[in-house]
Amino acid sequence: MKFALLSLAAMAVASPVAIDVRQTAITGDELRTGPCEPITFIFARGSTEPGLLGITTGPGVCNALKLSRPGQVACQGVGPAYIADLASNFLPQGTSQVAIDEAAGLFKLAASKCPDTKIVAGGYSQGAAVMHGAIRNLPSNVQNMIKGVVLFGDTRNKQDGGRIPNFPTDRTKIYCAFGDLVCDGTLIITPAHLSYGDDVPSATSFLLSKV
C-alpha cells in the first residue's frame, strides 16, 4: 500500500508545476564543472524527480539565491550515482549508502576545491534523508563550512528527532507541511507532501541570513 502511494505521489511530483523560477536552464552541476563562487548550494532532489536539482524546490531555491546574489552562487545537485529511486526510501537510512556517499563527496569537493566558499544545502523528501546521512558524518572542518541547510518534507524528521544528528540546529530549518505524514515517520504520501514550492522564498531567506 505504501509503495503504491509513493508511486502515485511520484507521478504527481513529476507533473509540470507553475512555470516560474522553477524551470530554467540550470544544469545543477556547477561545482563540478564551473569556477568557484562565494556561495555553493548543494541539493538532493526527491524520489523520481528529473535532473540533478529536481523540480519541486531545488531549482526554485537555486534561482532565488542567484537572483539575490548575482554572479556569486554555484548550484550543485546530488547525482548521477544518487538515482532518486522509490525503493531506496525503504532502506534503513531512508536512502542508499551510494547516495549518501556521493553527497558527502560533493561537500568535501566544495571544501577542497573552493576553500573560501560558504556552503548552503538542501534536500526534498528522500533528498532530505540523503542530507541527514551525508552531513552527520562529515569531518568537522567541512561541517563548519556549511552555513545553512533547508529540508522539505523530511523523511527522517521523526527518526532523527527533528534535526540532522551531529549538526547545529540553528543552521538547520526543516519544513514539514501540516498533514505531511512523511514527517511523522511514515512513507504515506498526501497532497501536503507536494506543497513545498510555497516554502522556497522562506527557505531562501533563511539560507541568505546565514551567509
From Swiss-Prot:
Q: Where is the active site?
A: 125 (nucleophile), 180, 193 (proton donor/acceptor)
Q: What class does this enzyme belong to in the EC scheme?
A: hydrolase
The answer to whether UniProt assigns keyword Signal to this entry is yes
Top-rank taxon: Eukaryota
Its taxonomic placement starts with: Eukaryota, Fungi, Dikarya, Ascomycota, Pezizomycotina
Positions bearing the site annotation: Transition state stabilizer: 47, 126
Q: Any idea what job this protein has?
A: Catalyzes the hydrolysis of complex carboxylic polyesters found in the cell wall of plants. Degrades cutin, a macromolecule that forms the structure of the plant cuticle.
- GO BP term, pick one: lipid catabolic process
Q: Which InterPro entries match?
A: AB_hydrolase_fold, Cutinase/axe, CUTINASE_1, CUTINASE_2, Cutinase_monf
Keyword annotations for this protein, in alphabetical order, are: Disulfide bond, Hydrolase, Secreted, Serine esterase, Signal
Signal peptide span: 1-18
Disulfide bonds listed in the record: 36-114, 62-75, 176-183
Quick one: a GO cellular component term? extracellular region
Which reaction equations make up its catalytic activity? cutin + H2O = cutin monomers
Where does it live in the cell? Answer: Secreted
* SUPFAM superfamilies in alphabetical order: alpha/beta-Hydrolases (SSF53474)
Pfam families recorded for this chain?
Cutinase (PF01083)
GO MF term set: carboxylesterase activity; cutinase activity; lipase activity
Similarity comment: family membership: Belongs to the cutinase family.
What is the protein name given in its UniProt record?
A: Probable cutinase 1
In short, the EC number is 3.1.1.74
The species this protein belongs to is Aspergillus fumigatus (strain ATCC MYA-4609 / CBS 101355 / FGSC A1100 / Af293)
